[in-house]
Each structure stands twice: as structure tokens, then as C-alpha cells.
Amino acid sequence: LHVGLNGTWPESGRRLQWTAKQQWKWNSKQRTAQQHSGVRGLIWLDIDQPGYHEISFSMREDGTEFDRWLMTTDPNFAEPDGIGPDESPMADVPDDAVDHSTPKVEPRGEDGTGDVSLSTDPTQWETVTLTLDGPWAREAGDDFNPFTDARLDVTFTHESGDFTYVVPGYFAADGNAAETSATAGTSWRAHLLPDVPGSWSYEVSFWKDNAPLKPFDGVSGSFDVADGKPDAHGRLEYVGERYLRFAGSGAYFLKAGADAPETLLAFEDFDGTVANKPGVPLKTWAPHVDDWNDGDPTWQGGKGKGLIGAVNYLAGTGCNAFSFLTYNAGGDGDNVWPFVRRDATFAYDCSKLDQWGIVFQHAASLGMHLHFKLQETENDDQRPGNQPTALDGGALGPERKLYLREMVARFGHLPALNWNLGEESTQTPAEQRAMALYLAEIDPYQHPRVIHSYPNQQEKVYTPLLGEMSELTGASLQNNWRASHQATLRWVKASAAAGKPWVCANDEQGPANFGVPADAEFGGKSIDYTPHDIRRWTLWGNLMAGGAGVEYYFGYQLPENDLNAENWRSRASSWTFAANALRFFQENDVPFWALDPADELVEAPATAWCLAGADAIVVYMHDATQGPAVLDLTDFTGTYTVRWFDTVEGGELITGSVETVNAGGKVELGTPPTQREGNAGHDWAILLTR
């Protein structure tokens, strides 16, 4: 603690030192270079004139609490007991006895004209950006906070009347902040993702201090949207089933990708991004700089290549998803937040968020699904103890509402994403429901809303949130790598029975210290399972239980771990196996959305799982060398063609020892067309079609 006198900070008042923790304690010691715990008798103020004097205090350490101050002229004064003597009366200071100064307020810029500009040549399923030349503001405004004192909404309506979106807007500084790092300006934005071509109209609602602000409020106009690409998938939507579906193509979606690093956005090329923990430095993503391609986006003279390249690499493997925390202040990484400062929860960093948006938009252009993890267990509430970074202490208050609105306004236009209420959420069910409901109210595109839990708290967390009135659309599952099938099956069935089927993905694999292991060439600890086991038990375990796919977590004790990873090649084999699984379902037109888990239909010497429908059946065998599987087709009719899929090598379907089977009883499926060499295992997927 530093003690000042009349606006000065004398050396004798500096570095008042305590060493006690979690208790109130009187002390009068000054920290020195030789004695960090402090030396008595070195702290004093020399007041050489009578009259009014101002004593000031400056806190040195975050987390230190300071409650009472005692002054004496006795150098031998003993430390008091308890709370000390009664407080002295405050001096009755005449108003003119001390100098007053007006706080510094930087000059305002001129307000904008109210003109609107739009993206050029907008097309169906491509983002249309509306920019309003609005009131001048700065991120950390003194007299006008653009995040709390104003609200922009833009209503977009298609000429047919069938599509209307009320889209939250946001303050965008000078409109080019990713390049300029601007903190002030007159640009305000909203984004539309148009479902259909044709004429669209817009009307601006702009309120300041709870009243419409002219000439900005009420600005309106129209624009034409051209036909999009005929094969465009469009927006990924929850449609009341256990799989998401694209609104444009009608295709159902399975995902596979990266859950790690959770600190993906702790990237040194983003403005205002700092590392708070020595063991969790900012990322360069240097191993992926060479994966950046000519024509890919950058900012500020070539920044961003590492992370853009990483996204290119992951998409190039055939995977289609990755996740990231957008707020981890006070958490494991403590290096990602959208604010201008870690604790400035009502002032958002325009340039940083624009730069995030460049990465997200590029990922979307590659068909990637973006998993927004909005918080983590360390900062979602106050239950573990005092956590100042928990927005509103875990409740749905002004901090949390603004945060969610800013995320929706800036990134909700992206076609494929989900909002995850939090990693390992420990908020109360009421708090979780309130957060999900608020997202549903402000997100015009109704992106899927999911929640993540500790493995041993799933019953406690998920059960109260089930039901047809739930605002959630899915579960982000964390389980031991070997328990993926059972856990997915549990919540697929429980959610359907409760009246609203959930989309259930396996997004984190235990044990927490290992997760999905790196490939052998990356070294690290020797553990008793391999990427082949992850393929057999985690990947196919989820898919064969009616799950929506996987994201892979990297643990915290293995190379390229959950906090410091910046080389996705460390899990190259796992990406290959996952992409093979996606291709099996997609390229062979497997109607997985019409198949139900039916493990009871298959008998095999080793573990086997089944998804069954009238026209297609998938059987997954963990070890096809143990003998043929027997499939009970008593309740089925017709003749089925039997083909095998190599889960390791991928490729086309091939015929084994049995080409067809007739339904009406139990049938043997035969043996696979080849036997694998080495330690890759002998798992195969079998597709039966009629």
C-alpha cells in the first residue's frame, strides 16, 4: 500500500507491507530491497504545517483489502487489538479549503450523418453488413458509453413477409478497427444472413438514454439480394431432432474437430491480448504459418497468418469444427476476454473483436462449425469462493446481458455455430435457464444452445434442464474416453423421453490430464491408450449412439496440451480417423438421421454397436477377427446388401465374405475383406442397405 500527502507520494509513505493472508492485521512496516516482509519504523508522513491535509491511498496488489488507517506521533505506539480505537470525526472541511479539478474528459468528435452503407452485391447465405454513420463514441467513453448508453437494433424484412429478423447492432469505432486499432468513431453495425434472394428492407432503431436518438432512429431503406450458390448449405439449425440440419441444402450435420486449445484466441496478433500466467504464454501459431495461402485474410500488414493457417490445416484434414473460450479471465488460461481491459466489463475492444471476426469469417468460408464456449467453471459464478471475474456473480445481470448481446451482435450472422453456456458449468439451474432464455430472446437466428458439465455432475446439471420447454438444444458431453457410447446414449434417450431431443456431442475426453494423446512422434508421457483407442471408443462410440460428433481435448500433461497447444498436427492421425467417419456417413448417403440406436440387434464375440432403420443399418464391430457378428432381422423385411468400411484407411465400401442377407430372422454378416497388420486394431463398420 502507498500513502500520499496532499497530492504527493513521499518515499516515507511508500510500500507499506503486510504478509498475513486471509485475516485482518495491523502493521506498520516498509518493504525494502533487503527485507521484503518489511522493516518497522520506516513508514511516516512529515506534516510540517497546521490546517487541512489530504491523505491518499494507492493499492499495490490486486486482492488486498484495506479497511482502517491510524496515525500517531508516538514512534513506540503498540499495534492495537481488534479493530482498534474509535474512529476520529472527519474534518468539517469548507468547500473552498481544497482545490477542485474537473476530471479530464477528452474532446468529442463530430457525430455522423445517419447515412447507411451496405455490403456490395449481397447474395443469398452470404453476410450482409449494414453500417450506420451514427453518433461519435469511444470504447471507454466518459460521458457516453456506446455499450451501455445506446442500443442499436436493425429490423430486416424480406419482401414476401416470410422472413423478419430483428438483429442486434454494435459499436464498431471507425469501421476499420481491425486495421487501424481505432478506439473511437461513428460506425455502428448489424449483420444479416439472408435466407432467400429478392428485395429486403431495413429499419434502424437507435436509442440513447432510453429515448430514440434522431437522426439515426428510424432510418430505413431496401436492397436486393442475388441468388446464392446452388449448393450452399446455409444456416445450421436445430429442427427438433437429435441432429442439426442446414436450412439451405437440407443436409443433416455431423461434426469432428478440435476442442483444444481452449485458449485458441490467446493469440499475440490480436490487439489488447496479454498473458497473465507465466506458464500460459500467448500463442504465435507459428507451426501453421506455412498453411496460410495467398489470398487468405490478414490484418495490419500480415498479422494473423498463424491462426488462419491453423484453420486451413484443420479444414484440410476433412474435419469441420473447433471450439474456443471467448472469456477466461480468472480461469486456467486467464488470457482471453473481449473487453478493453480484463476487468472493464462494460467497454468492449472493437479492434480485437474485429480481428476475431476475421478468423471466424474465414473459418465459416471453409465450412467450419464454430463452438463458442462463453465461460468456464472458474469464472461462471461465485460458488467456489470469491471470484471477481464472474459476470454478475453468475446471475443474469447487466454485465452478462451485455456480454451475450455483444457476442450475438458481432458473430451471430455466421452460418454454423453453437452457444455453449459454459465449460463445466456450476451455475444454478435457474441461472442456466435464464442465460439460455436471454440468448433465445436476442439471437435472431436461433443458433443451437448447449451446456457442458463435469462427468460426475451430468445428472445434476442436465436433468433439470430437460423437457419440451427447455431453451437448450443439446448437451456438450465430457466423459472418460471409453465411456462415450454409454454417456451419449443416456442423454439421447433421456432428452427424447422428456419431450425435446437434444443434439449430443462428445466434446471432452477424460482423464483430464491426458485427453486425446498426441501422435507418437510428438513424444510425451507413455499412457495405456492410443489414438486407435480414441477412434474405437470415443469417435465411433458417440456416432453409433445417435450422437452428433466429437471435438478432441488434449489434456494438460501431454505435448501440445489444452492450454499451450498451437500445432494441430500433433493429433494428425485422430483427425484422419474422424474425417474418415464423417465421409462414411456423408459420401455413402447413410440416412443417419433416420436411424435409431439398436445395440440389442447385434451379437458378436467382441463389442459391437448398431444403428438401425428400415432401409439402412449400420453395425460397428470393435474386433472383426473375433468371429462374425449376428444381426437379428426378425422384424425387418427384404434383402440387404452387406458392405464393409475400413475405419482406419477410409475409402470406398467393399464387399466381405457375405454379399447379401435376407431379413426375417437372424443372419451372419461374415468376415471383412482384409485383415489389418500392426497395432491399428480390427474395427470395421458394416453398412446394410436394401
Predicted regions and their residues:
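Short, flexible, glycine/charge-rich loop motifs used to bind or transfer phosphoryl groups or to couple energy/partner
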Residues: 59, 312, 407-410, 462-467, ...
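Short, solvent-exposed coil/turn segments at beta-strand boundaries
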Residues: 241, 249-250, 469, 545-547, ...
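Extracellular glycoside hydrolase catalytic/binding regions
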Residues: 402, 416, 422-573
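Aromatic- and carboxylate-lined catalytic core of secreted/periplasmic carbohydrate-active enzymes
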Residues: 103-106, 139, 500-504, 511-515, ...
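Short alpha-helical segments and helix-capping/turn motifs at coil-helix boundaries
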Residues: 52-54, 306-309, 488-491, 628-629
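Active-site mouth of glycoside hydrolases
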Residues: 151, 207-211, 228-474, 478-486
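Short, solvent-exposed loop/turn segments at secondary-structure junctions
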Residues: 10, 61-63, 76, 251, ...
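Extracytoplasmic
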Residues: 1-287, 294, 301-304, 308, ...
